[in-house]
């Protein structure tokens, strides 16, 4: 099951050239970028691990792509995403966010139903990947 989070999630994975074009677009709009990674892509897990610090002063698309590739190399079985931030409204908001790397296999989610008070049904999603230990969720074995 392909995780669909962020901009471009329904498109095929981007090449480095296409990622560079998006980086250039963000930098042209004065949006600083950051790289994040996780092995728990649950839709409510909005706080992924940061790769280094946000690149507020980096103006070169090649430098940002170098950080993306360093994160990919260090976390080959994780989801990696690139975020661009817009502070033009007086607060830091996400202007662009998209996944630049996925594990080879994405096991998907299970929907759990539970009956509550007054026979109200509550729903919870559970990632099959989280049944394995952190750091071992997308490796073969």
Curated annotation (Swiss-Prot):
Listed InterPro entries: RuBisCO_ssu, RuBisCO_ssu_dom, RuBisCO_ssu_sf
GO molecular function terms listed in the Swiss-Prot or TrEMBL record: ribulose-bisphosphate carboxylase activity
SMART domains associated with the record: RuBisCO_small
GO terms under biological process: reductive pentose-phosphate cycle
Keyword set, alphabetical order: Calvin cycle, Carbon dioxide fixation
Note: The basic functional RuBisCO is composed of a large chain homodimer in a 'head-to-tail' conformation. In form I RuBisCO this homodimer is arranged in a barrel-like tetramer with the small subunits forming a tetrameric 'cap' on each end of the 'barrel'.
Stated family: Belongs to the RuBisCO small chain family.
Protein name: Ribulose bisphosphate carboxylase small subunit
Organism, scientific name: Pseudonocardia dioxanivorans (strain ATCC 55486 / DSM 44775 / JCM 13855 / CB1190)
